[in-house]
Curated annotation (Swiss-Prot):
This is DNA mismatch repair protein MutL. PANTHER family: DNA MISMATCH REPAIR PROTEIN MLH, PMS, MUTL, DNA MISMATCH REPAIR PROTEIN MLH1. The gene is mutL. GO terms for molecular function: ATP binding; ATP hydrolysis activity; ATP-dependent DNA damage sensor activity; mismatched DNA binding. GO terms for cellular component: mismatch repair complex. Belongs to the DNA mismatch repair MutL/HexB family. This protein is involved in the repair of mismatches in DNA. It is required for dam-dependent methyl-directed DNA mismatch repair. May act as a 'molecular matchmaker', a protein that promotes the formation of a stable complex between two or more DNA-binding proteins in an ATP-dependent manner without itself being part of a final effector complex. The lineage of its organism: Bacteria, Pseudomonadati, Pseudomonadota, Gammaproteobacteria, Enterobacterales.
């Protein structure tokens, strides 16, 4: 094949593979553009988890009419102009790829107006060459980006999106991080026409605390220790939670570098080392930290989603964070200021960072100031030192043991005896006619133990099947529930546990924790392994049918159900789980229905012979035939 330049749309779609991972990625890029435009109010409207619509409206500076078409072109940006600008990034965006990439996998419309213009203009790109069309529009000062039908032209990408609830949960988390980074900006988040989140701008100390409480919770603020420390061009501000307070949530782990959300290994390692000797059992550190670094001493152009950075003086930054955090943790009891010089040196850290470009910018001698308690207003007086990441994404675990156990399970599975192959869709032996449909159970006399052939999907969740007895509608959710019930039925050895890659923290009530201890053996037979320590429950493993479920919601609900039972049997747990486990699909296609029925026929052959109520209903075609023949 000859070498040739790719069409603009295809090139943009390739770039979108890195920039646009899911709807939350689009929201992040658009909101960051609004912040770079100087907006102090951002309205976000979402429909169907962002798949149908993402609309971000701001009151920023807007885009000039002459530059509007360039805004949708690749590598066109107002953020940088020279290599020196790239080596000292102070804006959120700088590559000029986001809008072009998003417009190549959606129907994007950009409407904007500057204060100098008397009318607004609207731009959109379409076609193979991504030609931009600009036309007049009505709009106040600022910009609105509307993204319709995300991944409509890349069905493979759209197929791997999760449910509407899951995708909106990712969007909600992104907005939460940005709201914590910029407390001075009003952010409204709507979903399906309803106001879900409203983060009001903070102007004084009480408003700072109120907004932080709305994001991090009251428990975090009540137990947080304020941190403020500066050394030359390095500064760290924020809050760390006293590890002696066992009720503090380890899920709150936000870290920001020069206003950018970060999940950096070096920063995470420094914080965990500071907490190392103070955590008990399965405790996790909780913190909100804002790190300020000279832009010339940090490279943000090392990760497609800008979630990681590289520090030119990595060792100095690591020790600076370590000493600042451990100092405020050690002074928590006495309330007196602690001299930084008395802290022990930080444990060894060997990051994979590039060498320093030029001389050591931080090599000048300076007396480090002591860690001083400060108010939220003082900590956040500079709105540039912000960005965030959740705790679950920062935690590091040694997974060799887990991988070994998973490998053993996989080998045993592969060594099992293969089943006798049989035809999924047997040849039809009777005409497509059926007796008049009744509410009585359908009796299917079929030696092949097959429901028949799936012809089509009716509505969102019914399969139209052709069986030897005629046509019928089969409820796929009911079939899925019976399949789960068969999969969850414990054997003499119990269901095989599969360790979670990252153990899951659960917040349980006293009744739920009591049920966990009381029914630990029963839960173990279903592959559910959990432990309680210091008032917190840790879920370590579940069986295969439960791995893809919403475990933080499912397990507490199961424990709540067990807490209400004077005694519980395995059959009760199986029935409860089968009814409460979420369906893998909201809408079905023929391939998914075929796979489901094949599994049901293999594990539940009795359902083929005698389908229960609500599973299968034959269709009476006699009336239809009579109407067509005018009889």
């Amino acid at each position: 094949m000859a070498i040739k330049i790719l069409p603009p749309q295809l090139a943009n779609q390739i770039a979108a593979g890195e920039v646009v991972e899911r709807p939350a990625s689009v929201v992040k890029e658009l909101v960051e553009n609004s912040l770079d435009a100087g907006a102090n109010r951002i309205d976000i409207e979402i429909e169907r988890g962002g798949v149908k619509l993402i609309r971000v409206r701001d009151n920023g500076c807007g885009i000039n009419h002459q530059e509007l078409a360039l805004a949708l072109a690749r590598h066109a940006t107002s953020k940088i102009a020279t290599l020196d600008d790239l080596e000292a990034i102070i804006s959120m965006g700088f590559r000029g790829e986001a809008l072009a990439s998003i417009s190549s996998v959606s129907r994007l419309t950009l409407t904007s107006r500057t204060e100098e213009q008397h009318e607004a203009w609207q731009a959109y790109a379409e076609g193979r060459d991504m030609a931009v069309t600009v036309k007049p529009a009505a709009h106040p000062v600022g910009s609105t980006v509307e993204v319709l039908d995300l991944f409509y032209n890349t069905p493979a990408r759209r197929k791997f999106l999760r449910t509407e609830k899951t995708e909106f949960g990712h969007i909600d988390e992104v907005v939460r991080r940005i709201a914590l980074a910029r407390l001075d900006v009003l952010i409204n988040l709507h979903h399906n026409g309803k106001l879900v989140r409203q983060y009001r701008p903070a102007k004084d100390e009480s408003q700072y605390e109120r907004r932080l409480v709305s994001i991090c919770g009251t428990a975090f603020m009540q137990r947080a220790l304020s941190l403020s420390w500066q050394h030359d061009d390095l500064s760290i501000k924020g809050w760390v939670v006293d590890p002696m307070n066992t009720e503090a949530s380890g899920d709150i782990q936000y870290c920001y570098v020069n206003g950018r959300m970060m999940r950096d290994r070096l920063i995470n390692h420094a914080i965990r080392q500071a907490y190392q000797d103070l955590l008990r059992g399965e405790q996790q550190p909780a913190y909100v930290l804002y790190l300020g670094v000279d832009p010339h001493q940090v490279d943000v152009n090392v990760h497609p989603a800008k979630h990681e950075v590289r520090f030119h003086q990595a060792r100095l930054v690591h020790d600076f964070i370590y000493q600042g955090v451990i100092a405020v943790l050690k002074q928590r009891g006495s309330g007196a200021e602690l001299d930084i010089a008395c802290c022990e040196p930080a444990p060894a850290w060997e990051p994979e960072n590039r060498p320093s470009a030029g001389g050591n910018h931080f090599s000048r001698q300076s007396n480090a100031t002591s860690v001083a308690a400060s108010s939220p207003k003082e900590v956040l007086s500079s709105k540039g030192n912000m960005g965030g990441s959740r705790g679950g994404e920062n935690r590091q675990y040694h997974g060799d043991h887990y991988q070994k156990r998973q490998g053993e399970v996989y080998q045993k599975l592969m060594q099992s005896e293969p089943e006798e192959k049989r035809e999924l869709f047997p040849a039809r032996t009777a005409p497509v006619m059926a007796e008049k449909a009744t509410s009585a159970p359908v009796q299917v006399k079929n030696s092949n133990h097959s429901f028949g052939k799936v012809l089509s999907i009716y509505s969102p969740c019914y399969a139209l099947i052709e069986s030897p007895l005629g046509l019928g509608l089969l409820s796929l959710p009911v079939a899925e529930r019976w399949l789960r019930q068969a999969q969850l039925a414990p054997t003499e050895q119990g269901l095989k546990s599969q360790p979670l890659l990252i153990p899951l923290k659960l917040s349980l009530s006293k009744e739920e924790a009591g049920a966990l201890n009381r029914y630990s053996d029963l839960l173990g037979s279903f592959g559910i392994e959990a432990s309680v320590s210091h008032g917190k429950a840790t879920l370590c493993a579940v069986s295969l049918p439960l791995r893809q479920q919403n475990l933080p919601k499912l397990i507490p609900e199961l424990l709540g159900y067990l807490a209400q039972q004077p005694s519980a049997s395995a059959e009760q747990v199986v029935t409860w789980l089968a009814r409460h486990i979420g369906s893998e699909y909201e809408t079905w296609n023929v391939a998914q229905a075929v796979q489901l029925l094949a599994d049901v026929e293999r594990l539940c052959p009795q359902l083929v012979k005698s389908p229960p109520d609500g599973l299968l209903q034959l269709i009476d075609l006699q009336a239809v035939v009579a109407s067509l023949t005018h009889e």
